[in-house]
A protein has these predicted regions:
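Rhodanese-like catalytic fold shared by cysteine-dependent sulfurtransferases
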Residues: 1-20, 24-63, 67-113
Length: 113
């Protein structure tokens, strides 16, 4: 699996590149805060969610979870590769690395409801 660094991911977001960004954590963590443009990818629904949002198996997909010790984005990448997706990258540093760098996060407004 190919990885992507924080700086590479930030540059892609800043440029508005066309790619799908998924946080591979349960919804409650996603709603607390997530990276800009990210969509939630529950670890128990990888195939269903991605195939609906990204039907093109060659589209670029970036996955992340909490930090470099969190295995869920790696598991999701393996599952997506088995489904025929060919352009998957993992942001290994994850949400923690992004926060530690002081980069912007998005809070789901439903978190307070």
């Amino acid at each position: 699996m190919v990885t992507i660094t924080r700086d590479e991911l930030k540059a892609k977001l800043d440029r508005g590149d066309d790619f799908a960004l998924f946080e591979v954590l349960p919804l409650m963590y996603f709603r607390k805060h997530h990276l800009p443009t990210a969509k939630n990818l529950p670890p128990t629904a990888v195939a269903e969610v991605v195939s609906e949002i990204v039907p093109d198996r060659s589209a670029e997909i970036v996955l992340y979870c909490w930090d470099d010790d969190c295995p869920t984005s790696g598991w999701a990448a393996t599952e997506l590769e088995a489904m025929g997706y060919t352009n998957i990258r993992e942001y290994v540093g994850g949400k923690k690395d992004w926060i530690d760098a002081g980069l912007p996060m998005v809070k789901d407004p439903r978190q307070d409801s």
